[in-house]
């Protein structure tokens, strides 16, 4: 019978590596510490009833390599051996996975722990710097990812290792500051009467913000898809869309600056995910860094902290692979999150 295990021993190779999102799941297999990961086509979560079926048909049926262990990054709380995912119907059951897929050892981590692991060693070709600050590259870092929601993860450097710190930073309060904010915020969709950062800084939040602008300006909204809003904004073809993305960048800068102070992230703040990559031209305009640095009495500190957009297409898998190769370099907690045959 598989059972929870708190061992910090390295996962045995070959290792199945998975990044499980709400819409897509991405998988690779790492055969040893020196090999490049073998990548598999993305799996649509809606196409399979369970994650076990997706792994079997999307990975194991397509290779002769049988993984001995697995490390999976999931969006959702990891409290026991039945782990429901936040944005899809799958439930991760490590014990069932061990019994049914021939895997000996399963470790499950938070999706933004994986993103944090990735930013420990991103090369310049996999990140785009915003602003002039360079920071301290062996200091703590933080990663924010506006996507389906707003993920936040810290990466603390201590005792010669990188320690990922998961959390729910995307649900901090986000309040109005400017005159325009006070016009718009009464029209932002709330959760139990509060506006959290995630109510604006994600895909649906972009639509919330666009709709609020349309209401205040007395115009008919014509777009319901975040991709349409960003496309029109970057093309300059719709005034409301342009303001939406500009304010999105401002609010993201405010929250990113807050997180930089929380983690004392002298090593940098990293923006991950498809939205950050798509609106990179807007983030490079002054509004983002101005909002990021506007943190009196600590403006001087924020000016020294670099900000980046992660451009690596598979950052979470890269982070998990780094951990799988050299676990001694990372302080990843396995308590209550690792199961062995």
Swiss-Prot record:
Disulfide bonds: none annotated. Its EC number is 2.7.1.2. Gene3D superfamilies: 3.30.420.40, 3.40.367.20. GO terms for cellular component: cytosol. InterPro entries: ATPase_NBD (IPR043129), Bacterial_glucokinase (IPR050201), Glucokinase (IPR003836). GO terms for biological process: glycolytic process. It is found in: Cytoplasm. It comes from the Bacteria. It is an enzyme of class 2 (transferase). It catalyses: D-glucose + ATP = D-glucose 6-phosphate + ADP + H(+). ATP binds at residues 18-23. One of its GO terms (molecular function) is glucokinase activity. The keyword Nucleus does not apply. Keywords: ATP-binding, Cytoplasm, Glycolysis, Kinase, Nucleotide-binding, Transferase. Belongs to the bacterial glucokinase family. This is Glucokinase.
């Amino acid at each position: 019978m598989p059972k929870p295990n708190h061992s910090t021993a390295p996962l045995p190779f070959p290792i199945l590596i998975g990044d499980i999102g709400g819409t897509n799941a991405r998988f690779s297999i790492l055969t040893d510490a020196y090999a490049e990961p073998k990548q598999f086509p993305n799996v649509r979560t809606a196409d399979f009833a369970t994650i076990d079926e997706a792994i079997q048909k999307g990975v194991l049926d397509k290779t002769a390599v049988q993984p001995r262990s697995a490390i999976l990054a999931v969006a959702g709380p990891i409290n026991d051996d039945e782990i429901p995912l936040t944005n899809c119907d799958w439930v991760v059951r490590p014990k069932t996975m061990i019994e049914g897929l021939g895997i000996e050892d399963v470790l499950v981590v938070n999706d933004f722990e994986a993103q944090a692991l990735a930013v420990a060693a991103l090369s310049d070709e996999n990140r785009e710097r915003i602003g002039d600050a360079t920071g301290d590259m062996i200091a703590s870092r933080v990663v924010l990812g506006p996507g389906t929601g707003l993920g936040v993860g810290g990466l603390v450097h201590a005792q010669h290792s990188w320690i990922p710190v998961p959390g729910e930073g995307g649900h901090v309060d986000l309040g109005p500051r400017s005159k325009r904010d006070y016009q718009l915020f009464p029209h932002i969709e709330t959760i139990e009467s509060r506006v959290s950062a995630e109510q604006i800084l994600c895909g649906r939040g972009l639509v919330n913000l666009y709709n609020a602008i349309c209401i205040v300006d007395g115009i008919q909204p014509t777009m319901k898809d975040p991709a349409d809003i960003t496309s029109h904004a970057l093309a300059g073809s719709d005034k409301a869309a342009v303001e939406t993305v500009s304010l999105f960048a401002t609010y993201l800068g405010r929250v990113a600056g807050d997180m930089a102070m929380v983690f004392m992230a002298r090593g940098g703040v990293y923006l991950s995910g498809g939205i950050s990559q798509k609106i990179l031209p807007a983030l490079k305009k002054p509004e983002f860094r101005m909002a990021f640095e506007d943190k009196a009495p600590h403006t001087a500190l924020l000016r020294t902290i670099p900000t980046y957009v992660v451009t690596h297409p598979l950052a979470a898998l890269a982070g998990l692979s780094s951990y799988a190769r050299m676990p001694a370099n990372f302080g990843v907690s396995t308590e209550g999150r690792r199961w062995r045959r």
